[in-house]
From Swiss-Prot:
Name this polypeptide is given: Valine--tRNA ligase
Principal cellular location given in the protein's record: cytoplasm
One cellular component (GO) term of this entry: cytosol
Renumbered ranges of motif 'HIGH' region: 45-55
Keywords: Aminoacyl-tRNA synthetase, ATP-binding, Coiled coil, Cytoplasm, Ligase, Nucleotide-binding, Protein biosynthesis
Gene for this chain: valS
Amino acid sequence: MTELSPKYNPAEVEAGRYQKWLDADVFKPSGDQKAKPYSIVIPPPNVTGKLHLGHAWDTTLQDIIIRQKRMQGFDTLWLPGMDHAGIATQAKVEERLREQGISRYDLGRDKFLDKVWEWKDEYATTIKEQWGKMGLSVDYSRERFTLDEGLSKAVRKVFVDLYKKGWIYRGEFIINWDPAARTALSDIEVIHKDVEGAFYHMNYMLEDDSRALQVATTRPETMFGDVAVAVNPEDPRYKDLIGKHVILPIVNKLIPIVGDEHADPEFGTGVVKITPAHDPNDFEVGQRHNLPQVNVMNDDGTMNELAGDFAGMDRFEARQATVAKLEELGALVNIEKRVHSVGHSERSGAVVEPRLSTQWFVKMDELAKQAMDNQETDDRVDFYPPRFNDTFLQWMENVHDWVISRQLWWGHQIPAWYNAEGEIYVGEEAPEGDGWTQDEDVLDTWFSSALWPFSTMGWPDTDVEDFKRYFPTSTLVTGYDIIFFWVSRMIFQSLEFTGRQPFQNVLIHGLIRDEEGRKMSKSLGNGIDPMDVIEKYGADSLRWFLSNGSAPGQDVRFSYEKMDASWNFINKIWNISRYILMNNEGLSLEEAESNVAKVAASEAGNVTDQWILHNLNETIAKVTENFDKFEFGVAGHILYNFIWEEFANWYVELTKEVLYSDNEAEKVITRSVLLYTLDKILRLLHPIMPFVTEEIYAQYAQGSIVTVDYPTVTPAFENEAAHKGVESLKDLIRAVRNARAEVNVAPSKPITILVKTADSELEDFFTSNVNYIKRFTNPEKLEISSAIAAPELAMTSIITGAEIYLPLADLLNVEEELARLDKELAKWQKELDMVGKKLGNERFVANAKPEVVQKEKDKQADYQAKYDATQERIAEMHKLVK
């Protein structure tokens, strides 16, 4: 047995430990065919950069689950991997190239992709280093990447099969266009933000100049693509105009007036300009009336030649120029300022442009129906918390067809080929013969990510061992922000292609926020690098904080104060471990287990030993129950209370009565219970704190704690009598300590303690354990009896089954205490007067920073609480001397 260093130093504890685990292959599946499999696939982080605190939280929860299941004897697989993240990674590489004055077009597709692969290799290495720092017990022999050949094969098969079923189609429709990334976006890649904008009201004159029709738009630059104006066919103001024409301002082109129910007589003037190539509703109107589709923008958001004098201008520059021209022509009626919702690209942040474009789509109605129907079966996916099942179903009920093509170079190139005759060939391999050109677009990143749970297991080969044994996976851990992006798509793709759900459970967590509750972002500058936190506090401290920060589905607020508390808790565990191991005298764990069995059988030990084993049993049961429900915060609270309060503050202190005695037989039993309980604590903690538990475990046992058995309940430890007795003993000791503190009597001063109880069993228990009472209360005189009369002047405390009297004469000089309290009251009054004067100054309140004013208000509340408490104490003292 070696000795723990005097001070807990996480850097020393964690250094080299991860590599030792990897060298020992402890993270690989056991291969035990009799064991029940338990598998998790890691939500693959994007190879766009370093991992953030949200990744640390997400992976910590997964590691807790997989480590516990491994210890419980499951055949566990935690499969790691990364996502190519098409649009995001390409944007990062293009940004790096721009800094060198190079564009992707300068390089060409192949050389540009070489640069992206270099980026991927660089950041994949960084991510794996971060995983190691976090202590993640993943099986690297099964690591996957979404552009691996095996996964690419799965992607091609899914695309081709859906195409053959008619569930993937190509067509020209209005899509969300990102002018910065120059690619299409799906609906859920668009973030809507309220922005300051305007409605521009303008007149379109009838061709005979008899009257003008007023229309309004937030995007006047699109008017060059107007091909009609629409009125409601039932609107008496305009129905006689249907079939006539108006003159499109600036362009001086005649466009028809059509009757369509899209025009709402109750909204605005009841007249709507129709721009089929730049608005989804207008596109539908155009389809109904066979109107032309005029696209007036380039893919970078500049105006094309159809915008006339405005060609080449950025769309927002063109907006102002168009409005100025309309005003010059007298066609601008007014500008109505208003805040409205505008879509922004989730990746680039650019304002999204609705744009007519030829794209590939997934038809969603049947896939969504399968997913919703499955939630009514025994094969459903269980969400934790359950409310997210409703979120999932609601989205599925309202889902639109999914645009899956992206105008990028980095990603899975669409397996479709075209020839000069206009034929399309879709297949897993290129068509035979010459004259075929592959579609240059790539698939949406989420298309390949949706196959992650089964493509990583070897699908479409369903005979491989991993697919047969570990699919469906057991649990997915992910944030609520990607239920739509990813979780839902994995479910419907898995059901369609494997006939099974992709995972049995989904544990949803929230977002990491800063101390003020704000989302962490670059713009706010409040992001936290988890590696910086680990460098200061250690991975175990960070993991403890992340696992205890919130309940499933809730956000967590990061603060360094909480990190300090996490470190302090581990330091406490370290110190009590040192105490136990230093007093261990060479006792082995096997010997300790044998001696503990004697305690459970009441053949050895004392009531405090039986009490701690009973409480350990309860702790094991409650922690396991909450782990099974993914309530790690509740489990952590139970562990913290047992370790710090019951074990360290009470049992370890109680054992000193034995360890400092001359009774060698009792010492062996006490050491055994200490070592046994510590061992179970370390095993319970290991899934959360892998490094420090391994370090301490190695001091008294062989092998790694990673693969030892997880604690289970021992029926023989149940002992309600011992539990009840020691809890009463603790109540008595606490009551005396509190009374001392109330009247400022030092623990070192001996006092008289009178314990009155009519419960003969309790009296016998206190009497037989009087040594513990004396050790913790320092009495000059201690009486325990049913015949005690209450003294006239005494502090009285009532606990279950007993009354405790502390004669006042032994405690303090009442007159001196009252004088001291009067001085204290005057002090708090003075502080209240000072802060009250400051807050009563209107100039101070008006001109000082809000946080300064709040600080003074906090002071006032604190002083008032102290003043009130002192007043109450004075009143109590007066009652005692009456």
